[in-house]
């Protein structure tokens, strides 16, 4: 996980927000059951057996129209350039590659490299990416009218929702599916996990778990 959130969860929710409607997740068949809890319930997902992914993906994509987004490996929705780990191509061109190689071993014709993603191959790269992720999340909340007094001393899970006019004070940790209302003051030194905090509520130096406040 990064900032308390599994990478798979963050990526699926981010891509759904960008308009991706259907997901084909390729992995070892034995891992499918382990992955399901980390995928949003409202996501349209097909799990593909990694050992037979070429033929299975070909069967799934043959009737698809339009563009397909390919994500290779663990990737975070931050950064400037994906280095080719994330790219889009026409479904028909994707099928041609699968027929020829049995996998996405080459870029489909007309493929476009997608920006705004960061591949992470190991724990060290994941740790290095944390500051960038924290900044991206803070910027999203800034744009929505939230004030974060010290972004370098505030940790917000990407799943958290915060209403406009709310002020987040230093030392605050917001985790899980927490929802903070409008015009609240949170912190300093508050830890809130999987809670709903109503509008115009103040939470000061408290630890809240799975609760509704305000």
Residue ranges and their predicted role:
Residues 1-48:
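N-terminal glycine-rich phosphate-binding loop and ensuing alpha1 helix
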Residues 19-21, 64, 207:
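Short loop/turn motifs at secondary-structure junctions
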Residues 37-41, 102-109, 139-140:
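Short, conserved catalytic or adaptor-binding loops enriched in Gly and charged residues
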Residues 83-118, 125, 129:
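A glycine-centered loop/beta-turn motif at secondary-structure junctions
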